[in-house]
A protein has these predicted regions:
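Short, glycine-/small- and polar/acidic-enriched structural segments
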Residues: 25-167, 172-176, 193-199, 223-224
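Conserved C-terminal helix/tail region of periplasmic/extracytoplasmic solute-binding proteins
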Residues: 307-334
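Generic structural signal for alpha-helix termini and adjacent loop/cap motifs
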Residues: 83, 101, 189-190, 261, ...
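N-terminal export signals
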Residues: 7-24
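Secondary-structure end/capping motifs
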Residues: 238-314
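Short, surface-exposed acidic
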Residues: 60-66, 165-172, 273-284, 314-320
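Pocket-lining segment of extracytoplasmic ligand-binding domains
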Residues: 163, 171, 179-271
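Positively charged n-region of N-terminal signal peptides that target proteins for export
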Residues: 1-3
């Protein structure tokens, strides 16, 4: 009987361990980001260890956040779907494509925006003053042909300028380049004479004589609009509710830091980005009124409607809340 009792206790203990293991949240959360000041809020989250702090406050004291840097939104999407990372940061169009494709399976949802700062198309071609002047010899560098935020913004601008049927008018002019490589090409007199840019590359490009603006995402949106969001899978959300909440709280705190302490925000960017910019330069960039960082989703349905109309996504979301986790529904999004 003693042996049997010990066996029962051992069995119960094992069951308890299995149960605890099955319900335990992850102790390492991996987040994929891309280069540039677009990701400033995430840089702050990384530098100040905000996920670890908020997770500890929620009863998860041993959490560690790892940040992985990838070149383009499609790479981020692939990393999330494969399970290589838990949370991705990508443009609204790449996310919408993934959201449409994974409904009923992986079922991705947006967690938070990470900025509403403008994406800006610049050129060094003196003959091109507006997008209507772009010709067959021009080449536009952007992070992903046909799929990135910049690519879809260019299509939306083409549809507005030439009619809906002409939305792909500029697609043959586009080439895939990460922002650092695109800036180098633009300023080195290569065949690439246009770059759909973002900070801090934009400010460095515009400092060069002859480089000028053709189009901004603000023009396309008709005002500030979310250009990037963080997202994750149903599997991660259901298995890690405290981590999900900790991440959202971390992003909210990071946005407050940007508005209340730009110096600290600039220090975080310089510390983790690898960009060879001074803290003073970065602080001046993010102090520009056009650099909008906020947690409220804006304009996502406008992009979704365009992508649905062109057939890029097969499902039209009922409203912006269909795209985001329920924790975000209290915001006045669009």
């Amino acid at each position: 009987m003693k042996y049997k009792r010990r066996g029962l206790i051992a069995g119960a203990s094992a069951s308890l361990l299995v149960s605890r293991s099955a319900w335990a949240e992850k102790d390492t959360v991996r987040i994929a980001v891309q280069p540039g000041l677009t990701y400033l809020a995430l840089n702050i989250v990384e530098h100040q260890h905000l996920i670890e702090q908020h997770a500890a406050a929620a009863g998860l004291p041993n959490v560690r956040a790892e940040f992985v840097r990838l070149a383009a939104g499609n790479n981020v999407n692939d990393a999330v779907i494969s399970g290589a990372v838990d949370i991705g940061a990508t443009g609204v169009p790449p996310f919408l494509t993934l959201w449409s494709k994974t409904r009923g399976s992986v079922d991705v949802r947006a967690m938070t925006p990470y900025n509403s700062m403008p994406l800006v198309l610049v050129t060094r071609n003196p003959a091109v003053k507006r997008i209507e002047d772009l010709g067959p010899k021009d080449r536009i560098a952007l992070p992903g042909v046909g799929s990135s935020s910049q690519a879809v913004m260019l299509q939306m601008a083409a549809a507005r300028a030439f009619g809906q049927a002409e939305f792909r008018r500029f697609d043959p002019l586009t080439v895939t380049r990460g922002h650092p490589d695109a800036m180098a090409a633009l300023l080195s007199n290569t065949e690439i004479d246009c770059h759909f840019s973002t900070a801090p590359y934009l400010q460095q490009e515009l400092a060069v004589p002859g480089v000028h603006v053709l189009l901004t995402s603000t023009d396309v949106y008709g005002g500030p609009g979310t250009v990037g969001i963080t997202f994750t899978t149903k599997k991660f959300r259901e298995a890690n509710p405290k981590l999900e909440a900790a991440f959202i709280a971390s992003m909210d705190q990071a946005f407050r830091t940007i508005h209340e302490d730009r110096r600290a925000a600039a220090e975080a960017y310089v510390a983790v980005s690898g960009d060879k910019l001074s803290i003073e330069q970065v602080e001046s960039y993010i102090s520009d009124p056009s650099m909008v960082y906020e947690i409220t989703p804006r304009g996502t349905m406008k992009v979704a409607a365009f992508m649905y109309k062109t057939g890029t996504i097969k499902v039209m979301p009922d409203d912006w809340k269909a795209l985001f986790v329920s924790e975000m529904w209290g915001y006045a999004g669009s």
